């Protein structure tokens, strides 16, 4: 982790001078400012709470960095996090990155310039060294930012197993998975691995269908309709609930008999789509744990690297 002292040593100035450059306090020559800014750039250092700690200030402000609020799971999780933070005396500042690297960089700089005490990170568009350079305490949700960053997640792998097992138990033999961004750092990757393992155990063939999360709703409808028309799947595991609802509706319109299991289990789904069988994540517990861990990190407590909460299979009401 790059520290304020490292910047000072590289620039050949005092730590106080680096802090004054960061906070724009007092008179400084252009040459000094340039030296400090170049040192920060060379070291990939992003100013944070350490710089303002010299002034003894804390705004009780936590940055929340997530891909989007369009996804109902993220929307509910963010709401629960904000509520838990408020109870603990903290306010939240939200940044949505939309899977855009530059947008994440810009928002990260904005959060740190606004002197957040810590960041709860649910997005991942940068490199490991970019996250290592951030001195502000970080707790990640479902993302492996660096080997040293604490990460909180649901048991996505077990969720994939439970979903696939439910489809097999309901009589499905030709089971597809509709998945989004399943790179190795994505939670859907582990859900897919659970699906693959359970099919292997039952000697069933795999059918992996990519449905990129960046697609518009209209694009998803068109593509999924084509897929269902051209295949005779009798079971589909969707790695998110919104896609699962879409698959169920399109299959019904096409008069196809299809068992569908989703993933997330939000209050919205439970209230408005009670007939959807899904893998339910413990959203309240996730939010409470994320808030507790980031505050403990801010307070200087030692915490573990990995925290994983169990998921449950929630059967829809026929």
Swiss-Prot record:
Gene3D superfamilies (UniProt xref): 3.40.50.2300, lambda repressor-like DNA-binding domains (1.10.260.40)
Domain named HTH lacI-type: residues: 1-56
Residue range(s) of DNA binding per entry: 4-23
Listed Pfam families: LacI (PF00356), Peripla_BP_4 (PF13407)
Stored InterPro entries: Cro/C1-type_HTH, HTH_LacI, Lambda_DNA-bd_dom_sf, Peripla_BP_I, SBP_2_dom
Record-level Gene Ontology MF annotations: DNA-binding transcription factor activity; transcription cis-regulatory region binding
Keywords: DNA-binding, Repressor, Transcription, Transcription regulation
Superkingdom of the source species: Bacteria
Function statement: This protein may control the expression of the genes that are involved in the transport and catabolism of sucrose.
Protein name (Swiss-Prot/TrEMBL): Sucrose operon repressor
Gene assigned in the entry: sacR
């Amino acid at each position: 982790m790059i520290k304020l002292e490292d910047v000072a040593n590289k620039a050949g100035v005092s730590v106080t001078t680096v802090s004054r450059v960061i906070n724009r306090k007092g008179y400084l020559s252009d040459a000094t400012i340039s030296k400090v800014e170049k040192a920060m750039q060379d070291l990939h250092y992003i100013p944070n709470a350490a710089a303002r700690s010299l002034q003894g200030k804390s705004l009780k402000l936590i940055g929340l960095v997530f891909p989007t609020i369009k996804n109902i799971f993220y929307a509910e999780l963010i709401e629960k996090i904000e509520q838990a933070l408020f109870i603990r005396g903290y306010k939240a500042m939200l940044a949505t990155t939309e899977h855009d690297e530059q947008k994440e960089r810009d928002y990260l700089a904005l959060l740190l310039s606004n002197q957040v005490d810590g960041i709860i990170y649910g997005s991942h568009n940068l490199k490991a060294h970019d996250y290592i350079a951030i001195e502000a305490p970080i707790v990640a949700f479902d993302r492996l930012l660096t080997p040293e960053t604490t990460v909180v997640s649901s048991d996505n792998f077990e969720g994939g197993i439970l979903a696939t097992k439910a489809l097999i138990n309901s009589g499905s033999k030709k089971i597809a998975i509709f998945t989004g961004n399943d790179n190795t750092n994505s939670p859907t990757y582990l859900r897919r691995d659970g699906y693959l393992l359970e099919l292997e155990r039952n000697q069933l063939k795999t059918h992996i269908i990519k449905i990129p999360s960046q697609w518009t709703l209209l694009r998803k409808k068109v593509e999924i309709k084509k897929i269902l028309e051209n295949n005779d799947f009798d079971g589909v595991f969707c790695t998110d609930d919104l896609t699962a609802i879409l698959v169920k509706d399109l299959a019904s319109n096409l008069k196809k008999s299809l068992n569908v299991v989703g993933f997330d289990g939000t209050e919205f789904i439970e209230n408005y789509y009670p007939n959807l069988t899904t893998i339910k994540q413990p959203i309240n517990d996730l939010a409470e744990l994320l808030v507790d861990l980031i505050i403990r990190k801010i307070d200087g407590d030692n915490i573990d690297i990995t925290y994983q909460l169990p998921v449950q299979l929630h059967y829809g009401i026929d």
